[in-house]
C-alpha cells in the first residue's frame, strides 16, 4: 500500500470536477475515497484482482512503464491509470498479442472511477498499489506494456489453475498417501 505525495494530490485533485472541494475533503479525511470523471486527465483499465495483481507485479519487476494503480478490495478489481485517449493504442496492442485478452473495462469519457484518499489504511476498501507521486509523464509505451502484461498474466494464471486441476496439491497428495499407508497397515 502506498500513499500519495503532495504533488500527487495536486495532480489528481485537479482532475476532480471541484478541485478545491476534493482537496478540502482530503484535508479533512485523508482516507476518504473520491470519485473522478475519467477521460479528461486519465483513463483507467480495470481487471479482475488476480490478473491485475499479477500484471502489477510483472510491470514492476520488469521495470516497464506504468502509472498509478488502484485496488478495490470489495469489487476485487485492479485499475491501471493510462493517459487520456489511450484506448485505441491499448486496444490495438491487446489485439496484436498472441493470447486471448482477459475481461476488462476501459473507463474513459462518461465513466467515473473511485480512488482512495492520499493515505488509505490497511483494511480500507480502496488502496493504492502505486500512488500518484506527481503528474505522470506521458509515455506512449505505457498502454503497450499494460496490454502485453495483462495477456501474459491471464495466461499464467490459466496455466496455474489448469496445473492445480490436473495435479493435486502437495498437501492433498501427502494426506492421500498417508491415508493409504495407514489403511494398508491396518
Language-model region placement:
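Signature for HUH/AEP ssDNA processing cores
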Residues: 1-75, 84-88, 108, 120-186
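Helical (often loop-to-helix) elements that flank the catalytic cores of nucleotide-handling enzymes
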Residues: 83-109
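Long, charge-dense
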Residues: 101-123
Amino acid at each position: 500500500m502506498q500513499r500519495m505525495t503532495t504533488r500527487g494530490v495536486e495532480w489528481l485533485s485537479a482532475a476532480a470536477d471541484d478541485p478545491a472541494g476534493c482537496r478540502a475533503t482530503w484535508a479533512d479525511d485523508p482516507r476518504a475515497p473520491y470519485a473522478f470523471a475519467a477521460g479528461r486527465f486519465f483513463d483507467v483499465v480495470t481487471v479482475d484482482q488476480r490478473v491485475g495483481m499479477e500484471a502489477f507485479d510483472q510491470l514492476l519487476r520488469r521495470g516497464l512503464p506504468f502509472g498509478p494503480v488502484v485496488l478495490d478490495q470489495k469489487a476485487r478489481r485492479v485499475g491501471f491509470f493510462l493517459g487520456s485517449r489511450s484506448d485505441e493504442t491499448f486496444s490495438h496492442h491487446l489485439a496484436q498479442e498472441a493470447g486471448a485478452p482477459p475481461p476488462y473495462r476501459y473507463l474513459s469519457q462518461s465513466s467515473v472511477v473511485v480512488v482512495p484518499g492520499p493515505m488509505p489504511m490497511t483494511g480500507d476498501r480502496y488502496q493504492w498499489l502505486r500512488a500518484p507521486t506527481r503528474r505522470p509523464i506521458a509515455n506512449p509505451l505505457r498502454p503497450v506494456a499494460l496490454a502485453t502484461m495483462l495477456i501474459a498474466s491471464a495466461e499464467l494464471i490459466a496455466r496455474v489453475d489448469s496445473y492445480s486441476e490436473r495435479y493435486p496439491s502437495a498437501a492433498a497428495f501427502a494426506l492421500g498417501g498417508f491415508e493409504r499407508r495407514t489403511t494398508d497397515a491396518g
